Amino acid sequence: MSVPSRKIRLIMELRQNGVSATPVLAAIERVPRDAFVSAPFSDQAYENTALPIGCGQTISQPLVVGLMTQALDLNDRHKVLEIGTGSGYQTAVLARLCRRVYTIERHGALLREAEARLTALGLHRTVVTREGDGGRGWPEQAPFERILVTAAALDIPKVLVAQLAIGGVMVLPVGKESGAQEVVRVRRTAEDALVTERLFPVRFVPLVDGLPPRDAPGA
């Protein structure tokens, strides 16, 4: 099956499983997922499955990318904070839908690879990257209208809530690494008021504090 046919099949699968927002589907269709997976997995790039990318991380299942992006309810005026750049695939989808993406990755090797991919796609003007501890957010660029976290937190991080604009939305997986996890949508309705919604079950790597040791693989 050709790449265009595989991509069409994937888009149809996402639509059938709850990704109904036309802008989100269009953004996913415009981002070449095969550019974000390593060569041994290139034949699976347009399968609805997560794939390893190194450093113990994965490129998320396209359905999860679609549903979480849809839950953000993005527009082209939004400034978005992404915690966990990973391969850069989710970053690229966000960049097709908003004004600016600020994305943080704790693994330097992954970030450098993601930066190269985003530059090759001409998205480097929309995306600002940082190697760092995502749990701390990016306070000097706050507030953000939208925040997306791509690793599972044990609870809703207060540090990130403080960087969310009033009226803003944060979408993140919540739960233990070895237990049940759910994607939660958080709306900050006032300075000290949040409205939360549980959306769907997922399985993500945990949100880890700090940076990996410099002698660790992929650091």
Curated annotation (Swiss-Prot):
Major localization class: cytoplasm
Q: Spell out the InterPro entries in the cross-references.
A: PCMT, SAM-dependent_MTases_sf
Q: What class of enzyme is it?
A: transferase
GO BP field: methylation; protein modification process; protein repair
Q: GO CC annotation: what is one?
A: cytoplasm
CDD domains on file: AdoMet_MTases
Quote the SUPFAM superfamilies the UniProt record gives.
S-adenosyl-L-methionine-dependent methyltransferases
The UniProt keyword set, sorted, is: Cytoplasm, Methyltransferase, S-adenosyl-L-methionine, Transferase
Cellular localisation: Cytoplasm
Recorded E.C. number(s)? 2.1.1.77
Supply one GO molecular-function term: protein-L-isoaspartate (D-aspartate) O-methyltransferase activity
Look up keyword Methyltransferase and say if it applies.
yes
Q: Which domain of life is it from?
A: Bacteria
Show the Pfam families listed in the entry: PCMT
Query: Which reactions are catalysed by this chain?
Result: [protein]-L-isoaspartate + S-adenosyl-L-methionine = [protein]-L-isoaspartate alpha-methyl ester + S-adenosyl-L-homocysteine
Catalytic residues identified in the record: 60
**What does it do?**
Catalyzes the methyl esterification of L-isoaspartyl residues in peptides and proteins that result from spontaneous decomposition of normal L-aspartyl and L-asparaginyl residues. It plays a role in the repair and/or degradation of damaged proteins.
User: Per the similarity annotation, which family is this?
Assistant: Belongs to the methyltransferase superfamily. L-isoaspartyl/D-aspartyl protein methyltransferase family.
In terms of NCBIfam families, this protein maps to: pimt, PRK00312.1
The name under which this protein is listed is Protein-L-isoaspartate O-methyltransferase
Q: Which organism is it from?
A: Rhodospirillum rubrum (strain ATCC 11170 / ATH 1.1.1 / DSM 467 / LMG 4362 / NCIMB 8255 / S1)
